Amino acid sequence: HEEWLSGAGQANVSLYNQSGHGPIYPTPVVGMVGLIPDAARAAAVGIGFREEGHAIAMCGTPQPSLAGSELAKLRGVPLPTTLPQADFAAVKRAQDAVRDAVRAGDLASAHDIAEGGFLVAIAECCLAGDIGAKLDFTSGHDAPPSYAELEPYLFGEAVGGFIVSGTREAIER
């Protein structure tokens, strides 16, 4: 049984802001409060990678697009009028999978893919855990993909993706 506290009717999102340096990207934010049945277990799963040899995986459906990303912003690419459409059913499946794996004690770490995309999230996990990561992008390819092919996957900021780590057996579950 999940209970939620609601701030219904209390919303303030401004999609037009300016500063002396130019427009500020729109940033709608949703905050929620809920009950966690086993808060100690949830708190034990941080963003930092924990052990050498753990498997690292992405949970969620990648949407290869740099539209509205930090990388596009750094390159001076104007904010597009449309962004990739989120598949909310897929996002919910990814969130449910991560939640269930945390509850089962299967994950050593979990981190959302947000600002900066997949590669920035990996770097944040490495820094938080004071441990490196070895990544292989050739799996399932006859030849290694080019950087141009990988870039939207590495730096895209599509909603609903997570980096998780744990034992290989736990990750494969």
Model-predicted segments: where are they?
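Short, solvent-exposed amphipathic alpha-helical segments in soluble enzyme
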Residues: G46-G53, K73-G76, I122-A128, R173
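Structured alpha-helical segments in the cores of large, soluble enzyme domains
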Residues: H1, Q85-D100
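Glycine-rich anion-binding loops of enzyme active sites
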Residues: H1-A67
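Short amphipathic alpha-helical segments, especially helix-boundary/capping motifs
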Residues: L71-R75, D96-R99, Y147-L150
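Gly-rich Lys/Arg/Thr-decorated short loops/hinges at beta-loop-alpha junctions or inter-strand turns
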Residues: L66-Q85
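Glycine-/charge-enriched secondary-structure boundary and capping motifs
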Residues: W4-L5, G9, V13-G31, P80-T82, ...
